[in-house]
Amino acid sequence: MHPKTDHIEKIITENFRYIRDIKKIEAINHNDINSKNFLIYSKKSKYVLKFLKNNQQKRNKQIQRILYRANQNGIKVSIPIKNESKRKILDDVILSKFYNGKTFSGSVQELESFGYELAKLHKFLKKSKVKLQKDKNIGSYKLLSPKDITRIKKIIGQSSNPNKIDNMVKRRLEFLQQINQRHSEFQKKRKKFDEQLIHNDLHTDNIIFFKKNISVILDFYFMKRGTILEDVSYSALRLSEQTSKNFKNIEKMVNLFINTYSKYNKIHQNELLNLNYFLSKNSLARINHILRNRYFHDSNSWVQQLPLHFKLLDFSYKIKLEV
């Protein structure tokens, strides 16, 4: 075993002693900046070891209990493997089974399978009485104020060496201010929507298929209370964008997935009437988070995803709901 992975093998041998004969440990390349993941090869199976970076032990334990109960209710989620140690380190170190499979390929069968499984998940989460501790970073995803936009513009203007990210942000600031303002006004006057626990991070890497059917839904550590349409619309947009660059095809697939999901779990009409708001909500939050980090906290976390989320934000206000 390589010296760099010796400490990982030690964690496993001390806390998961029933996993024998570790053959190899590899770092997993992924988009989740909130954890560091490793693929563990043993003689009989493969596992994923996740080191959470959020320092929210209570929240992590709450989510793990939710996942255990979901699994017991037949929901296809990845559950932490119970350890044999009471050591504090295990509060933020999660071992789970590795699932073979592929990301979305664009088939109707995959959409049907995921729509059914997501509806089951939402029905289960709706019954949960857990008062989930809020993500401590949630504030960085809030709407940007006109003062924030002005501050970002000033920082870019004063830069002696702006790069292509800065130039892209500068070009989109007026549009971004309009969308943030639109969301702010909507949130002040909107009717109250039904909220429950939702996944809140259903991008393509967290939805795994095997033989065109859902194998597992991964990574629930961004969970929050929200509307089911937030999950449905964001996952529809991410799945659609992965398989086509043509707007009409993306619009068609988003509508197809909403209709597929609705066969198994009703989406309230007042939410559907505001589809563009929900379609744009997640990408706007992520853009705002990235810009706050970059310009206010000197951090480039997730900055590589900025072009994607600007593109999704553009799509969000062009897509029309088919009736």
Which stretches of residues belong to each language-model region?
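Conserved NTP-binding catalytic cores of kinases and kinase-like/nucleotidyltransferase enzymes
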Residues: 1-82, 322-323
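Active-site acidic catalytic loop and adjacent metal/ATP-binding pocket
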Residues: 32-43, 48-49, 181-230
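ATP-binding pocket architecture of kinase catalytic cores
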Residues: 42-133
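A glycine-centered beta->alpha junction motif in the catalytic cores
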Residues: 92-106, 154-158, 281-297
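A cross-family kinase active-site recognition segment
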Residues: 110-169
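ATP/Mg2+ or Mg2+-diphosphate-binding catalytic cores
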Residues: 151, 286-323
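Active-site activation/catalytic loop segments of kinase-like enzymes and analogous catalytic loops
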Residues: 229-266, 280-298
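All-alpha amphipathic helical-bundle segments outside canonical DNA-binding/catalytic cores
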Residues: 267-279
